[in-house]
Amino acid sequence: MVRKIYFLTLLYFALCVNTRSCTDVIMFSFLDKTPTEFDLILDPHKLQNVAFFTNEEFKVILKNFITDLKKNQKLNYFNSLIDQLINVYTDASVKNTQPDVLAKIIKSTCVIVTDLPSNVFLKKLKTNKFTDTINYLILPHFILWDHNFVIFLNKAFNSKHENDLVDISGALQKIKLTHGVIKDQLQSKNGYAVQYLYATFLNTASFYANVQCLNGVNEIMPPRSSVKRYYGRDVDNVRAWTTRHPNISQLSTQVSDVHINESSTDWNVKVGLGIFPGANTDCDGDKKIITFLPKPNSLIDSECLLYGDPRFNFICFDKNRLSFVSQQIYYLYKNIDAMEALFKSTPLVYALWQKHKHEQFAQRLEMLLRDFCLIASSNASYLLFKQLTQLIANEEMVCGDEEIFNLGGQFVDMIKSGAKGSQNLIKSTQQYRQTLNTDIETVSSRATTSLNSYISSHNKVKVCGADIYHNTVVLQSVFIKNNYVCYKNDERTIMNICALPSEFLFPEHLLDMFIE
């Protein structure tokens, strides 16, 4: 299309020139474009309802403000600052030290502190040619301030240790540099230890990308240019580590095969669904780090195969390295006849499938892949998983009126297969749907319950993280020797191997198959 328009333009231009006499001279001139300039508005009269204070003025205001707040006899951190100030100033004995300033702050839409010295706020910002010299700080409307915010501002503006000498041994964890506390600088992943001790900045690049899910195994297809940028040449048969952060599970890091994208303008990342459940990944803003591995490097390659590749290491503790996501489970449930026909082509697979016929479909699939790996090999389970993904390659799901209005249809099969949800979820959703807008009592109690469960689950995540770390540290020192479970050394025996629960041992139903 562009080429066609360009050609027509040239044709038109040629015709115009031909219609003139040969003596005519056509002149072209280019006008200078006026440069765009950005000015910082520091004149308070040009802005509506803004409270301007210089750095020095604001320091004094904060000091007086906190002094007044300390006089509050009924201190409650959940009260707004306005409530706390009303409590203070209704007491006749307390005199407001700065009534004009306070009125100015409350009436304004925002507070701007000007003439700031160079500090942590500014150093963190990346500046470019369009950025002014940022020597101001914009604070939100006073209604959004709370007690903690004021204390934080006071620490930032009225810091006692600005130019003092401090005792390193005691204050190492408290000294603030332009980028934060020294302790963090030594320990954090972007601190001195990483950037300066290695005498180089590591070649990292991060970007936001749309994730397109591949109905596949442990495979990824990153943007073509990211592979080219790393290797500097065309490569094939490349491996990469994919790690989800925070990585609290052994399966957060997995080895993936890198497929080269044919398109050079496709900036999406395509990820195989097999590694999603293990790493607890979803596509709502999760952070995933893709680490390309040097090629050729046979040592790293062999490590990948030994520790992270489902072809050679399908089971990781009590989980499979590859699992199906709920939509795939539903599709397989729909195609159960075709799937069982595939199993019958390999008698061993069908025998294992029949072993767990009383289990729900989703659990049955997991158990089949695990058992097949233990009896045949990791690679056998990997290939079976791959075959099953190909079986449902062209499936799709479309919701109609039955699903939208009655929560029936495909939802019923999805619950039956064990892919997602439960009958109770459907029941409670229908119950919630019937709630009236005017039923304030019910809505408010649900909101409170929801908030409380959110807070408690947030706490649980932190506690679980600590527990997982603790268990890992302890279990690293546990090993089996001479039919005893030992801790740290051979002499420190904890118990006989017979006391181990059956979950730690080879599954009994598979041993029975060999004995029979």
Curated annotation (Swiss-Prot):
The keyword Transcription applies. Component of the viral DNA-dependent RNA polymerase which is composed of four equimolar subunits of LEF-4, LEF-8, LEF-9, and p47. Plays an essential role in late and very late gene expression. Belongs to the baculoviridae LEF-9 family. It comes from Autographa californica nuclear polyhedrosis virus. Pfam families: LEF-9. This is DNA-directed RNA polymerase subunit LEF-9. It comes from the Viruses. Keywords: Transcription, Transcription regulation. The keyword Transcription applies. Interacts with LEF-8, LEF-9, and p47. GO terms for biological process: DNA-templated viral transcription. InterPro entries: LEF-9 (IPR007786).
